[in-house]
Design a protein with these regions (language model features):
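A conserved regulatory-domain signal marking ACT and ACT-like small-molecule sensing domains
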Residues: 309-400
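Rossmann-fold NAD(P)-binding glycine/threonine-rich loop
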Residues: 81-87, 98-138
Length: 400
C-alpha cells in the first residue's frame, strides 16, 4: 500500500482526497497497488468530518513518517509551501503541487533537488487546471522544437471577457458577477491584471527552453482597461478580445507577453469561452496541437494532481527527468515583437495617416467622436513612438 499526504485542505486539497476515494479502484489497477491517504496537513480542525482523524498541524509529522511516499501540496503561495515541499523532498518523498506561484519561483531548484534525492517533483495542475500540458511538453512533444505557445490560461478573465462580449456589460459589472459565482477572488488582482497568466507562461516557457524564465521579465497587461466600446469595435471586425499568454521563439531567442489580443473567427482560440482554458502549441514538425478543457475548479484541478500521484506511484524508485535548469534565460525585449495594432483616438484622419501611414479604419455601431483603426505590422517600439507622436490615444489592443 502506498501512503499519501495532502498539505492544504482547501478547495483543491479536498478535491484530491475526493478523487483518491471515488477512483481508488481504478487508481489501484493502474498503479498495481492501493493508494491511501494517511495525513492531511491544515491549520484547522474539521470536527464531525471523517477527515478529522487524518488531520495533523505540524508538517514534520509527514516528513518524518517513513510510510508516506507521496506528498500533495495544495496550499498556494510561495511560503510556507516552499519550505514544506523542500523538506519533503529532502526526506526522500515524491511531491506534486498545483501551486503555480511556487513552481514559477522555485521550480528549477525543486526539480534539481528531486533529481538529487531520486524522487519526483511534479506540477501538472499548476498550469491549465485539468488540461494536460506539462506532461505532453516533457514527453509526447519532445521530438519537436516548440516554436510557439499561446494560451487562454485564466478562467476568471476568460469568463469575464465572454460576459462582456455577450451581454455588453462593463468590467465592474462582470467582475461582481464573477465574484458572486465564485469564479473571481475577493481580491481579483492576480487574475484581472494578468499576473496569474504570466506565471503560467513563465512555467511553460521554462519547460520548453529548459532554462529558468523569470515571470518578472514578462511584459504583462490585464483586462481592466477593456471597455464595452472596445467590444463593439471587436464585433464590427468579426473578432473577439481574449487575454492571451504567448511565448515565441525567434531568431534572437524567446519572447513572452501577456496581453489582450483581437482574435479572428478563424483562430483556434476564438471560440474558447466562459471558464474554459485552451493552450495552442506549435512545433516545427508537429505543426499545431491544441489542449482544451476546464482550466480551474475543484475536481478538474484535483484530477491533474492525482494524475501526478499515479505517475509517481508507478515510479517510486526512479526520477523522471524534467529539463529545467536554474540557468536564467534572458528574454528578447517584447518591444522588438511585430504586430498589427487596433487603436482608438480622438485625433483626425489627417493626423492618423501622417503618423501611421496606411491604416484600415473600423466603424462600430453607436460610437462617435473618435476614430478606430488597425495599423500595418510594426514593432511594439515603433507603435509606442507613433502613439506618443499622435497623442489623444484612447485604447491600443494587439491584433492576432
Amino acid at each position: 500500500m502506498i501512503k499519501v499526504a495532502i498539505m492544504g485542505f482547501g478547495t483543491i486539497g479536498s478535491g484530491v482526497a475526493e478523487v483518491l476515494d471515488i477512483n481508488k479502484k481504478s487508481i489501484a489497477a493502474r498503479v498495481g497497488d492501493e493508494v491511501e491517504l494517511k495525513y492531511v496537513l491544515d491549520l484547522r480542525d474539521f470536527e464531525g468530518d471523517p477527515i478529522q482523524e487524518k488531520i495533523v498541524h505540524d508538517y514534520k509529522v509527514i516528513a518524518e513518517d517513513p510510510e508516506v511516499a507521496i506528498v500533495v501540496e495544495t496550499m498556494g503561495g510561495v511560503e510556507p509551501a516552499y519550505t514544506f515541499v523542500k523538506t519533503m523532498l529532502e526526506a526522500g518523498k515524491h511531491v506534486t503541487t498545483s501551486n503555480k506561484a511556487l513552481v514559477a519561483a522555485k521550480g528549477a531548484e525543486l526539480i534539481a533537488l528531486a533529481k538529487e534525492k531520486n524522487v519526483n517533483f511534479m506540477f501538472e495542475a499548476s498550469v491549465g487546471g485539468g488540461i494536460p500540458i506539462i506532461r505532453p511538453l516533457n514527453s509526447c512533444l519532445t521530438a519537436d522544437e516548440i516554436e510557439e505557445i499561446t494560451g487562454i490560461v485564466n478562467g476568471t478573465t476568460n469568463y469575464m471577457m465572454t460576459e462582456m462580449t455577450e451581454k455588453g456589460a462593463d468590467f465592474n459589472e462582470v467582475l461582481k458577477d464573477a465574484q458572486a459565482k465564485g469564479y473571481a477572488e475577493k481580491d481579483p488582482t492576480a487574475d484581472v491584471e494578468g499576473y496569474d497568466a504570466c506565471r503560467k507562461i513563465a512555467i511553460l516557457t521554462s519547460l520548453v527552453c529548459g532554462q529558468q524564465v523569470d515571470f518578472e521579465d514578462i511584459h504583462t497587461e490585464g483586462i481592466t482597461k477593456i471597455t464595452p466600446t472596445d467590444i463593439k469595435y471587436a464585433q464590427a471586425m468579426g473578432r473577439a478580445i481574449k487575454l492571451l499568454a504567448t511565448s515565441k521563439k525567434g531568431p534572437k531567442g524567446y519572447t513572452a507577453i501577456v496581453a489582450p489580443f483581437l482574435l479572428p473567427a478563424s483562430h483556434p482560440l476564438y471560440a474558447v469561452n466562459g471558464v474554459f482554458n485552451a493552450i495552442l502549441v506549435h512545433g516545427n514538425v508537429l505543426g499545431d496541437a491544441m489542449f482544451y478543457g476546464s482550466g480551474a475548479g475543484k475536481l478538474p484541478t484535483a484530477s491533474a494532481v492525482v494524475a501526478d500521484v499515479v505517475e509517481m506511484a508507478k515510479n517510486l524508485d526512479k526520477n523522471i527527468p524534467i529539463e529545467w535548469s536554474s540557468k536564467k534565460l534572458e528574454l528578447v525585449d517584447y518591444k522588438e515583437w511585430e504586430n498589427r495594432f487596433f487603436i482608438r483616438t480622438t485625433a483626425d484622419k489627417a493626423a492618423v495617416e501622417r503618423v501611421f501611414g496606411t491604416v484600415t479604419y473600423v466603424q462600430a455601431e453607436g460610437v462617435t467622436g473618435e476614430l478606430g483603426f488597425v495599423t500595418e505590422k510594426i514593432s511594439e517600439a515603433d507603435c509606442e513612438k507613433k502613439e506618443a507622436e499622435l497623442g489623444n490615444i484612447l485604447q491600443k489592443i494587439r491584433v492576432a
